[in-house]
Amino acid sequence: MMIRSPEPEVKIVVDRDPVKTSFEEWARPGHFSRTIAKGPDTTTWIWNLHADAHDFDSHTGDLEEISRKVFSAHFGQLSIIFLWLSGMYFHGARFSNYEAWLSDPTHIGPSAQVVWPIVGQEILNGDVGGGFRGIQITSGFFQIWRASGITSELQLYCTAIGALIFASLMLFAGWFHYHKAAPKLAWFQDVESMLNHHLAGLLGLGSLSWAGHQIHVSLPINQFLDAGVDPKEIPLPHEFILNRDLLAQLYPSFAEGATPFFTLNWSKYAEFLSFRGGLDPITGGLWLSDIAHHHLAIAILFLIAGHMYRTNWGIGHGLKDILEAHKGPFTGQGHKGLYEILTTSWHAQLSLNLAMLGSTTIVVAHHMYSMPPYPYLATDYGTQLSLFTHHMWIGGFLIVGAAAHAAIFMVRDYDPTTRYNDLLDRVLRHRDAIISHLNWVCIFLGFHSFGLYIHNDTMSALGRPQDMFSDTAIQLQPIFAQWVQNLHAGAPSVTAPGATTSTSLTWGGGELVAVGGKVALLPIPLGTADFLVHHIHAFTIHVTVLILLKGVLFARSSRLIPDKANLGFRFPCDGPGRGGTCQVSAWDHVFLGLFWMYNSISVVIFHFSWKMQSDVWGTISDQGVVTHITGGNFAQSSITINGWLRDFLWAQASQVIQSYGSSLSAYGLFFLGAHFVWAFSLMFLFSGRGYWQELIESIVWAHNKLKVAPATQPRALSIIQGRAVGVTHYLLGGIATTWAFFLARIIAVG
C-alpha cells in the first residue's frame, strides 16, 4: 500500500513567455495609461507621467500581473544596488589610500576620492595623512573592508568586478521572470514556502556563510593586522581556507578539526567563538570572535526557523491557522481574515514590512555607536556621526512609508463587507477614542516638555540659576534610564557569567577604551538635560504618529467626508461647493507626517551630535585625563532653548561658515546651496495654485505676442503636485544643510 501526500508532487508555478519582449513601448511614454499615452496637451502631462509610472495598481487590476511587475522591479532594484556597491569598491581600488590607511589607521584618514584640478579645485583635496591628498570619506567602508579581511586594492578590484557581474545577472533575472518564466499568483501567495526559504536560505545560510568567512578569513587576517604585520606579508584569504595548519598556528584548536563539535566538547572552540562583551582595546571595535560567534548562533536559529512551516509534507505551522487562533477575551474575531488581507494586498504587506524595517534601521543607528562593530570605527568620529544620522533619516522615511501604504491599503484593498469584528474592524470602530486620546497625549507632552525649557530660559534670563531645572539646581534625573543602565552594567556578573564585560561600555561600570589617544567609548552619563530632550523626542514622535495614524484610520471615511474611499488615496478637496474639505486625503496626512518626521529626527541627531562631542568623544592624555571636544557643556547648556541656539547651532556652525578657502569649502557651498533648496520649497508650500495660474497666463500672453507660444499649454501645478514638490525640496534642503553642518564641524574638530 502506498501513502501519497495530499499535495501533487510537482506544481507548475510559472507561465512560459507571458509577455513579448519589445522595445516599442519605450518610445511611447505613458503606454501604461490610455489618457497619458495620448501625449501632452498641457504641462500637467509630465507630472501625471511621473506620478503613475510606478503605480502598478493603476495600470491593471490583475493581481497576478501586478505581482509580476513588482517582482521584476525588485531585480532591477538589486541590480542598481550591486552597481552602486561595485562603484564603492572600485573607488576603493582605484582612487583610495586604503593600503596606507590599513598600515596606520589611527593617523591616516580614509579617502577614496580625488577631485580633478579644474579651475583651482586643488583646494578640495585635503591632507588626510601619510602624504595622501583627497576628500575625507565618512561612509565606514574602510572599516568594513578591514573587518572582512581585505588587505589589498587588487582584492577590491576583483570584488568590484564581481558586483558588476551580479548586477548584470539581476538585470537578466528581472527580464527573465517577467518575459520568459513569470511566476503564477499562487507562487507569490505561498507564504509558508516563502518563509522557509527566506529564513533558512537568506538569513540562515547567509549568516552561516558569513560566520564561516569570519572564522576562516577575517579572524586570522585581523590577528596579523592587529599584531602590526605588513598587509603584504599576510597570507592570502584562500591560503587560510586551503591550509588548516596556518589557522592552527593562530588558533590551536583548529588542529582538532570537527572532533570537539561531535564530542560536544564545544568549549575548545572558545578562542575563536568567544563571549567576551565590550570592545577590543586595540581597534576599539567589538571582538571579531564575538561577532563570528553571534553569526553562527543566528544561523542556527534561522536554520531551525526555516523548517517550521508546513509545505508539501503536511507537518509544521500553517500561517492561516496561527493567525486565526490568535484571539483573546477582548479582541472579538482576533486576526481572522488577516491571512487573506496579507496574501491579496501587497500594500498591507509592504506597510508591515516598512514599519518593521524602519524600526530596525533606527535600532541599527543606536547600535553602531554603542557597540561599534568594525575596527577603528569608534575613533573615526566623522563616520560615527554620519552612520547615526544616515540610519536615523532612513528609518524615519521608512516608517512614514509604512503609514502611506497602510492608507493605500485602506483605500484600495480593504473590503468592509467581509470584515466584521476582527481586530482591524474593532480598531476602526473606536478610532475616535484612539485619536482623541493620542491628541491629548501630544498636547500634554508638547506643553510640558517645552514648558520645562521655557521655564529654564526665563529663569536664566532673569539671572536665577538656582531656580532652573538642572543637575546643579532643581534636579530631574532620568531615574528609570539610569536604572536600566545600571542593570546592564551589572549583567556580566549575574545574568551572563561567561561574559567579561557588559554588551556596551555606554551602560556604565567605569571602563574606558581609547585607541591612539582618542576615546573610542566610555560610560555615557545621563542627567537632567537628557531628561528634558527625551521628552521632546516623546512629543515629536507622538505627533508624527498622531498625523500618520489619523491618516490611516480615516482614509476611507470621516464625519466630514463619509464617502472618502470613493475619492481615492490622493485628492485636493471634496469637490466644489464643499468648503473646508481640502487637504484631508490620506496622501495629505503622509505629506504632513513627513514634516513631523523631519522634526523628530532633527532633534534626535542634534541631541546625539552634541551629547557625543560633550560627554564621549575627545582625547586622553598619558596621565589618563580625558578632554572632550566641547568640554562637557551639554549638561548645563542644553537645558535652555537659548543654549541649543547659542552653544550648539551657532557655536558649531563656525566651521562650516568659515570653511571657504580650506579643503572643507565644498561643505560651505553645500550649506549655502541646501539652504537655498530649502527656502525654494517655501514658495510651493506658502502660495496658492491660482496665483501661479494668473502669472502663467500673463507669460503665455507675452509669448503669443512674440509668436513663440508652445504647442503644449502651460498649467500651474495642481495642489497636490505643488505640495509634493514643496515637501521634497524642504526635506532635501533640510537634510543636506544638516549634512554639511555636521561634517564640516566633525572633520575639523574630530
UniProtKB/Swiss-Prot annotation:
Key word Transferase present: no
Top-level taxon in the UniProt lineage? Eukaryota
Residues reported to bind phylloquinone: 692
- Residues binding [4Fe-4S] cluster: 573, 582
Instruction: Indicate which residues the UniProt annotation says bind chlorophyll a.
Output: 683, 691
Instruction: Tell me what reaction this enzyme catalyses.
Output: reduced [plastocyanin] + hnu + oxidized [2Fe-2S]-[ferredoxin] = oxidized [plastocyanin] + reduced [2Fe-2S]-[ferredoxin]
Q: What is its main location?
A: plastid
Membrane topology per the entry is: Multi-pass membrane protein
Keywords (alphabetical) are: 4Fe-4S, Chlorophyll, Chloroplast, Chromophore, Electron transport, Iron, Iron-sulfur, Magnesium, Membrane, Metal-binding, Oxidoreductase, Photosynthesis, Photosystem I, Plastid, Thylakoid, Transmembrane, Transmembrane helix, Transport
Q: Which note does the record give on the cofactor?
A: P700 is a chlorophyll a/chlorophyll a' dimer, A0 is one or more chlorophyll a, A1 is one or both phylloquinones and FX is a shared 4Fe-4S iron-sulfur center.
Q: Name one GO cellular component term.
A: photosystem I
What Pfam families is this protein classified in?
Answer: PsaA_PsaB
GO MF annotations in UniProt: 4 iron, 4 sulfur cluster binding; chlorophyll binding; electron transfer activity; magnesium ion binding; oxidoreductase activity
What sections of the protein cross the membrane? Answer: 70-93, 156-179, 195-219, 291-309, 346-369, 385-411, 433-455, 531-549, 589-610, 664-686, 724-744
Q: Where in the cell is it found?
A: Plastid, Chloroplast thylakoid membrane
EC number assigned by the record: 1.97.1.12
Q: Which GO terms describe its biological process?
A: photosynthesis
Q: Which amino acid positions bind chlorophyll a', per UniProt?
A: 675
Q: Which family does it belong to?
A: Belongs to the PsaA/PsaB family.
- Subunit info? The PsaA/B heterodimer binds the P700 chlorophyll special pair and subsequent electron acceptors. PSI consists of a core antenna complex that captures photons, and an electron transfer chain that converts photonic excitation into a charge separation. The eukaryotic PSI reaction center is composed of at least 11 subunits.
**Job description of the protein:** PsaA and PsaB bind P700, the primary electron donor of photosystem I (PSI), as well as the electron acceptors A0, A1 and FX. PSI is a plastocyanin-ferredoxin oxidoreductase, converting photonic excitation into a charge separation, which transfers an electron from the donor P700 chlorophyll pair to the spectroscopically characterized acceptors A0, A1, FX, FA and FB in turn. Oxidized P700 is reduced on the lumenal side of the thylakoid membrane by plastocyanin.
User: What is the name listed in the Swiss-Prot or TrEMBL entry for this protein?
Assistant: Photosystem I P700 chlorophyll a apoprotein A1
Q: What is the lineage of its organism?
A: Eukaryota, Viridiplantae, Streptophyta, Embryophyta, Tracheophyta
Gene label:
psaA
